[in-house]
Amino acid sequence: MINNWVSSSKELQLLVDDYLLTVNYRSVIENDLVNYTQGIESYFRNERLTLRDKINKFIEELPESYRELLSEHVGNTDDWIGKLVSTRVFLTHGDRENMAVSNPYKLVQMTKIFGFMVRIFILQKLGITIDKPKILNKFKNVLTTH
């Protein structure tokens, strides 16, 4: 793992930095969502893609079992990505027409699920695998904490 970290790309290090901002410092959930999306944007910064396409690519790079877990809990992944992007646009630019998720509970759930997937992505890039029962347990904890 240490070798993987030392040899990791600058983009992965930027993603990890944004992820750690959310887990090491208390902030409002809206900032967490912005930090996660900023991390994904940084990771794919050398690719000419929209934020929506970057998040889609990020999800496509997750192992299939995690993509399935995501779709089990959010329904249509494409719609979920659209809500995620629209909410981030609102939080960043204040355009209320783009606020896709205004319900605080749903915003917390969406952000926690997104953060969980970012964590899995980072661990995968560092070569760390976690057994499925342990992941399912951690995911349940994410869904039940506020």
Predicted segments, located by residue:
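Amphipathic, oligomerization/interface secondary-structure segments
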Residues: M1-H146
